[in-house]
């Protein structure tokens, strides 16, 4: 029962971070900027991010199950930090329309996700595999962010 409740809390926390970030999503500004031909359709972002946040939550939960909060303070701190960075990216990109700062921030976010993955690996190897789609998506999002910045500069 305790583990099930903890899993629900990890998922709720992750989806809470997603909800904060989604407050700044798309809208007229994004619809009006120049996009590359390979830009994904808007409808894909919601389901894709939800799945990735859920996988990250399960990974963090697995780490907690193996080491507890005391034994996994560092890895779980990294987990919380990268969730916060993800929300900041949404605010910079969609809320402030600062593609330049968002690009720099997404590089930091990617590094934070990678550090989280490595920290999880020391405690629970399968937990380090679950964030791989998230890491790949953020790499893609970084390339897209950089391309959008270049196409819309000036």
Language-model-derived ranges and their functions:
Residues 14-28:
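Alpha-helical transmembrane segments of multi-pass membrane proteins
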Residues 91-101, 149-154:
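Membrane-interface helix caps and helix-loop-helix hairpins in membrane proteins
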Residues 1-12:
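N-terminal membrane topogenic signal
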Residues 131-149:
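Final/C-terminal transmembrane alpha-helix of multipass membrane proteins
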Residues 40-54, 96-109:
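Membrane-interface loop-to-helix entry segments
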Residues 93-99, 115-129:
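Membrane-helix boundary connector in multi-pass membrane proteins
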Residues 26-39, 151-154:
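Membrane-interface helix termini and inter-helical loops of multi-pass transporters
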Residues 54-90:
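Helix-adjacent hinge/juxtasegments
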């Amino acid at each position: 029962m305790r583990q099930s409740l903890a899993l629900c809390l990890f998922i709720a926390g992750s989806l809470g971070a997603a909800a904060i970030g989604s407050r700044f999503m798309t809208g007229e500004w994004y619809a009006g900027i120049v996009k590359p031909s390979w830009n994904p359709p808007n409808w894909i972002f919601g389901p894709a991010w939800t799945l990735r946040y859920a996988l990250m939550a399960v990974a963090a939960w697995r780490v907690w199950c193996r080491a507890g909060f005391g034994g996994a303070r560092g890895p779980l701190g990294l987990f919380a930090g990268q969730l916060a960075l993800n929300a900041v990216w949404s605010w910079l990109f969609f809320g402030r329309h600062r593609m330049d700062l968002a690009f720099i921030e997404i590089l930091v976010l990617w590094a934070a996700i990678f550090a989280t993955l490595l920290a999880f690996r020391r405690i629970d190897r399968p937990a380090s595999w679950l964030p791989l789609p998230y890491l790949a998506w953020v790499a893609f999002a970084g390339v897209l962010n950089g391309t959008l910045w270049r196409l819309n500069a000036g």
